[in-house]
């Protein structure tokens, strides 16, 4: 089962709030799923009371197949989700430390409920048995591709970067990672970061030639 015909990773694109019957009243935006199948450990299938040749025979058998779906949803941009500098608590160089004050809200909590319900329904209709939902503890930072803290915008008072990813008050500094985003979508943003970086680099070259940097 380590080679040949076997299941692989799967991706379910967003299907909520894209029009018509897909629209929901209890949350905005949407989510997608990433998932796949795998076999459990052979040792988990062997009873602890086994020993000797019987035990050796059991642990050579592959474990049961399992399929999972993990939901990835958009987090709306909330004004009170923010990063600030703590000037009362400095690091060893005397610089202010960073303080994060952010959490998911009612919109995301309602979305998580729907994620679980829909995943269970999909798997059961596909013929899987012993389907269980799981809603683990979540905190910002566990989604790998976190976004925000240096958002793009036109207003200097409400954003850090301009449309070219330049820091408003320090034009020779560009920020092109997830910090520039205003909200976290439900898809992998890596290609978007690459595009923003290429655009910012092109802009920087042009500005440098004009002696503006």
Where are these regions (language model features)?
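Mobile, glycine/GP-rich and aromatic-enriched active-site lid/loop segments adjacent to catalytic centers
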Residues: 98-142
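Hydrophobic, well-ordered secondary-structure elements that form the walls
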Residues: 85, 119, 152, 177, ...
């Amino acid at each position: 089962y380590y080679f040949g015909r076997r299941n692989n990773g799967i991706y379910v694109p967003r299907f909520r709030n894209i029009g018509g019957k897909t629209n929901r009243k209890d949350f905005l935006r949407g989510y997608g799923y990433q998932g796949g199948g795998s076999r459990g450990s052979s040792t988990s299938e062997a009873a602890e009371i086994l020993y000797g040749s019987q035990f050796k025979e059991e642990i050579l058998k592959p474990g049961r197949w399992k399929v999972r779906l993990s939901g990835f949803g958009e987090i709306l941009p909330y004004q009170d989700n923010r990063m600030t500098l703590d000037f009362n608590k400095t690091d060893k160089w005397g610089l202010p430390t960073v303080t994060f004050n952010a959490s998911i809200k009612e919109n995301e909590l309602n979305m998580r409920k729907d994620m679980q319900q829909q995943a269970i329904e999909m798997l059961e209709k596909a013929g899987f048995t012993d389907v269980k939902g799981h809603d683990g503890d979540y905190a910002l930072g566990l989604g790998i591709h976190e976004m925000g803290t240096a958002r793009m915008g036109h207003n200097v008072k409400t954003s850090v970067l301009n449309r070219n990813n330049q820091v408003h008050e320090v034009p020779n500094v560009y920020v092109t990672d997830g910090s520039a985003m205003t909200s976290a979508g439900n898809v992998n943003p890596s290609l978007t970061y690459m595009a923003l970086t290429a655009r910012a680099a092109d802009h920087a070259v042009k500005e440098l030639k004009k002696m503006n940097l």
